[in-house]
Every structure is written in C-alpha cells, then in structure tokens.
C-alpha cells in the first residue's frame, strides 16, 4: 500500500533527439530563464526611461558572467583537487558539459558582470550598480526557479531520505528510498520570492531605497538556501557538529545572507531613492 502511494520520478532528461543533437529539459529551462528575464528587464527599462538599446549588451554580459562564474564556482568550490590537480582536469574547466555549474559562482559572476555593465553604460543613463541590481534580482528569482526545475528533470540536487508524504523516489538514481525534493523546495522559494519582490517593485518602489531590493534578495534567497541545505545530501562536507553536517552550500550561502542584511541596512541609511527621476524613454520610431 505504501509503495502505491509513493511518488516516483523517472522522466527522461532529454526532451527531444534531433539526430546527433539532444535537447535537454535543463537546457530549455535555462534558456527560457534568460528569455523571460530579457523581457522583464525591457519592461523595467521602458517604465523607468532607460534606453532599450542597452538591453542586448546586458544580455551578453549576463550570459557570459553566469556561465563562466557558475563553472568556475563548481570547479573551485566543489572539486579543486580534480580540476587543478592535473592537466586533464584543468582542460575540463573549459568543458561545462563535463561536470557541473554552481549557483554561488553564478551569483558572483552576475555581480561582476553588473559592475562592468554599469561602469560602462550607467553614468550616461543615470543609473548605478545598485539601481540595476535591484531589478536584476527580480529576474534571478524566476530564472533560478526555471533552473531548479531543470535540475528536477535531471534528477539532481536531491535530499536525504524522508518519510514525508511528498518524498520522491528518483528512479534514475537507482535508489529505492523516497528523498526530499530539495530542488523543488528551492524552486518554490525562488518563485515565491519573485512574486513578492515584483509586488514590492510595482506597488512600493517609491517608498524603497536604492539597493534595498538587492539586500532583501540576498538576505532571504541565500538565508533560505542555507536552511534548505540541511535537507540536501551533501556533495562536499566541510565539517560536522554532532550529527549536523555543514557542507559547502552552507559555507557559501550564509555569508551572502549576512552581506544582504548589511546592504539592506546601508541602503536605508544612505537614503537614495530607488527610482530614476525622469520621463519614460520612448522607443525611436522607424523611418
């Protein structure tokens, strides 16, 4: 009877085979996050009078920053001995399809990419790093949810054994025990945060300070990420406190959350309005 009630997950991670090319669910959801994000940022730019011609450079900067940052993050944080211990491993650093990506590295990459972009384009348009970061984190919430759904299709980022009714048997792993679907917990967290932060942006932006949404995002996103790590089977254990395992995810998440609290407080004390005070930008008419 219990086996009948157990949720099994055995979906092929490959959505479509096109000759030698395979389209994976993860890739589709990853790209969908960027496409959806582009349209979100376009709506922000239109609403606040920023030149839409700056959207494409932002897209390229984010694509490069996320992929490079996430790949280096995986190699440095999770398996440096392999990737930097031999030439074979080092060459695989440049082959992200062999190994993985790390979200904390992707976050660092996004920050670096935004610093470059705002330094190059922001002064002319009247915005700075924190103005743009306040809006990009809204995109990151929904893109992060898409990526975690991609992890679900890949049967990865799986938690410990559980007897809870929503525990899932991931048949493709070969383990018959129900597990915490940690990737779905994270997807739901990011989606909920995205809805709340869109509401703050749409309804309360005139009452917020520049950098405040960025601080709120770091605080709650990585705070929750750190807590959810306690349900996840660790890939790299850093140390233990009694029966409690502290893994690399904890070690990377909580500093981000603490930084978020600091940015949140600093933005309120600084008191710079979150908006750009000017007329909305009008897209040039075609001749």
Model-derived segments and their meaning:
Residues 1-287:
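A feature for loop-to-transmembrane-helix boundaries and adjacent hydrophobic helices
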């Amino acid at each position: 009877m219990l086996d009948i009630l157990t949720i099994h997950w055995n979906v092929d991670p490959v959505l479509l085979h096109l000759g030698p090319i395979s389209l994976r669910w993860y890739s589709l959801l990853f790209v969908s996050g960027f496409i959806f994000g582009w349209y979100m940022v376009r709506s922000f730019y239109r609403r606040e009078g920023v030149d839409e011609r700056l959207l494409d450079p932002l897209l390229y900067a984010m694509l490069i920053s996320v992929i490079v940052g996430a790949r280096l993050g995986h190699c440095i944080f999770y398996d440096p001995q392999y990737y930097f211990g031999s030439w074979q491993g080092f060459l695989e650093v440049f082959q992200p399809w062999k190994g993985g990506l790390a979200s904390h590295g992707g976050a660092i990459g996004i920050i670096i990419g935004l610093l470059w972009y705002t330094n190059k384009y922001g002064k002319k348009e009247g915005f700075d790093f924190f103005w743009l970061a306040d809006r990009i984190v809204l995109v990151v919430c929904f893109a992060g949810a898409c990526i975690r759904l991609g992890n679900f299709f890949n049967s990865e980022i799986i938690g410990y054994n559980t007897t809870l009714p929503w525990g899932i048997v991931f048949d493709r792993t070969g383990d018959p025990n129900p597990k915490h679907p940690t990737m779905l917990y994270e997807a739901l967290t990011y989606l909920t945060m995205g809805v709340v932060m869109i509401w703050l942006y749409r309804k309360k932006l005139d009452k917020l300070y520049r950098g405040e949404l960025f601080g709120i995002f770091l605080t709650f996103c990585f705070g929750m990420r750190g807590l959810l790590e306690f349900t996840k089977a660790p890939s790299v254990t850093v140390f233990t406190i009694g029966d409690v395992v502290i893994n690399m995810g904890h070690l990377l998440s909580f500093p981000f959350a603490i930084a978020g609290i600091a940015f949140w407080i600093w933005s309120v004390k600084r008191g710079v309005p979150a908006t750009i005070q000017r007329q909305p930008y009008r897209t040039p008419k075609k001749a």
